[in-house]
């Protein structure tokens, strides 16, 4: 799979790139700063990094891995360059009181299908290997969701689970806040593993 990671120079984007390169995917790291994207791409063995607009060209999946406060502006700025390519939104807005998730808001801006997922994964754990936990993906477009689930299965030691339609994205984004709270309270590195499924 050829994957563009927009925001790929940040902690989560870079950790995700590292795992996908290890899995044999062709990864293009995108950034507002093309030189920084090239530097980070060489660190993880990814394809040459590029400015975001160039990075999203000719890929199978675009991962929107910017910080939450930049996700919507980035989706807006890249809408034309992304075209109809599927987008996986991994950002979580921990302070939002908006009824719609970031992924749902992004869906209104880009021409292709948007799915959401990987919100329960911590950048720090992902940077050091495939976490022994499950990854969740939701979306309305089955083909786009299948691509995101394929990606998710490559980066966790647990399972990639279909969490339903895109309307579940708000709940998935909220998982981040719960995990952060648990880690602060118990001074740990919590992750999620679902039991009782076949």
Give the ranges of each region predicted by the language model.
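Hydrophobic Val/Ile/Leu positions in short beta-strands of Rossmann-like dinucleotide-binding domains
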Residues: 5-6, 64, 137
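Rossmann-like NAD(P)-binding element
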Residues: 52-86
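General beta-strand structural signal in soluble alpha/beta enzymes
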Residues: 50, 113-119, 160-163
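Rossmann-fold NAD(P)-binding glycine/threonine-rich loop
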Residues: 91-129
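Residues that mark the start of a beta-strand
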Residues: 2-4, 86, 134
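Active-site-lining helix/loop region of Rossmann-like oxidoreductase modules
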Residues: 125, 133-198
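NAD(P)+-binding Rossmann beta1-loop-alpha1 motif at the extreme N-terminus of oxidoreductases
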Residues: 1-43
């Amino acid at each position: 799979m050829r994957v563009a990671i927009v925001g790929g120079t940040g902690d989560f984007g870079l950790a995700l790139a590292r795992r996908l390169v290890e899995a044999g995917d062709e990864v293009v790291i995108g950034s507002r700063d093309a030189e920084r994207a090239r530097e980070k791409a060489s660190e993880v063995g990814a394809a040459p990094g590029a400015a975001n607009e160039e990075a999203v060209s000719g890929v199978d999946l675009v991962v929107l891995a910017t910080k939450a406060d930049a996700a919507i502006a980035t989706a807006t700025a890249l809408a034309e360059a992304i075209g109809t390519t599927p987008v996986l939104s991994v950002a979580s807005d921990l302070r939002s009181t908006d009824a719609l998730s970031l992924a749902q808001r992004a869906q209104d801006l880009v021409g292709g299908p948007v799915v959401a997922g990987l919100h329960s994964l911590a950048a720090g754990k992902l940077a050091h290997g495939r976490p022994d936990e499950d990854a969740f993906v939701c979306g309305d477009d089955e083909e786009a969701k299948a691509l995101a689930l394929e990606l998710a299965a490559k980066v966790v030691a647990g399972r990639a689970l279909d969490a339903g339609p895109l309307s579940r994205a708000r709940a998935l984004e909220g998982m981040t806040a719960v995990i952060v709270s648990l880690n602060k309270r118990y001074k740990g590195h919590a992750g999620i593993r679902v039991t009782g499924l076949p």
